[in-house]
């Protein structure tokens, strides 16, 4: 199974190093010297990590065969993909790999069906579940413990306790706003 572990950013210096946006909780395992990674786009790789270091809080990598700034710039925005055993699980029981969460059914605490996880977006502040509803629309659920209260891999579901307005249909939210305004005027 393949897992996106990083995205290559800008070139750093003139000797072929690049900045890397890490997308794994185990960078020392997945992004160490000697690691061979597939790429997206595939035509760029595979890439073998030659060296890695942290500079000003950013991970810098150099790949075999990339010796100058031009070569490094050509790699910009390339996704780095590691091969992962599908049975491998994170050490922390409250951590999950993307492939474990994909296609989970999402329900509220009271059992109301919301939809199915179709994508996980890794943003700087938090991860987001992209959930496809039965009508084909999408809703975005922040993957934070205050909202996602349970992940049950055996039952293939994620239980959420959404704040008002997070998953409500726009029409329902608009009608409750109108009702509240009417009551306030009375």
From Swiss-Prot:
One cellular component (GO) term of this entry: ribosome
Acidic residues composition bias: residue spans: 174-186
Q: Which GO terms describe its biological process?
A: ribosomal small subunit biogenesis; rRNA processing
Which residues belong to the signal peptide in this entry? none
Q: Which domain of life is it from?
A: Bacteria
Q: List locations, semicolon-separated.
A: Cytoplasm
- Per UniProt, residues of the PRC barrel domain are 93-166
- The entry's keywords: Chaperone, Cytoplasm, Ribosome biogenesis, rRNA processing
One GO MF annotation is: ribosome binding
Q: Where is this region: Disordered?
A: 160-186
Pfam families (alphabetical): PRC_RimM (PF24986), RimM (PF01782)
Q: Which InterPro entries match?
A: PRC_barrel-like_sf, PRC_RimM, RimM, RimM_N, RimM_N_sf, Transl_B-barrel_sf
Family of the protein in this entry: Belongs to the RimM family.
The record describes its quaternary structure and partners as: Binds ribosomal protein uS19.
Q: What does this protein do?
A: An accessory protein needed during the final step in the assembly of 30S ribosomal subunit, possibly for assembly of the head region. Essential for efficient processing of 16S rRNA. May be needed both before and after RbfA during the maturation of 16S rRNA. It has affinity for free ribosomal 30S subunits but not for 70S ribosomes.
Task: State the domain notes.
Answer: The PRC barrel domain binds ribosomal protein uS19.
Kindly provide the name given to this protein in its UniProt entry.
Ribosome maturation factor RimM
Record organism: Streptomyces avermitilis (strain ATCC 31267 / DSM 46492 / JCM 5070 / NBRC 14893 / NCIMB 12804 / NRRL 8165 / MA-4680)
Q: Which gene encodes it?
A: rimM
């Amino acid at each position: 199974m393949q897992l996106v572990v990083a995205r290559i950013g800008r070139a750093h210096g003139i000797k072929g190093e690049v900045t890397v946006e890490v997308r794994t909780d185990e960078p020392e395992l997945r992004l160490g010297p000697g690691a061979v990674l597939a790429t997206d786009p595939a035509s760029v790789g595979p890439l073998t990590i030659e060296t890695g270091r942290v500079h000003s809080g950013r991970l810098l990598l150099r790949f075999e065969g990339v010796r100058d700034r031009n070569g490094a710039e050509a790699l910009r925005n390339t996704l780095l993909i590691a091969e992962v055993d599908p049975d491998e699980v994170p050490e922390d029981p409250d951590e999950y790999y993307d492939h474990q969460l994909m296609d989970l059914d999402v329900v509220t605490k009271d059992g109301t069906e919301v939809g199915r996880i179709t994508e996980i977006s890794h943003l700087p502040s938090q991860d987001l579940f992209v959930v496809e509803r039965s009508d084909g629309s999408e809703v975005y659920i922040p993957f934070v413990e205050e909202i996602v209260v349970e992940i049950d891999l055996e039952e293939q579901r994620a239980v959420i306790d959404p704040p008002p307005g997070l998953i409500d249909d726009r029409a329902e939210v608009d009608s409750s706003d109108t009702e509240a305004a009417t009551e306030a005027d009375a």
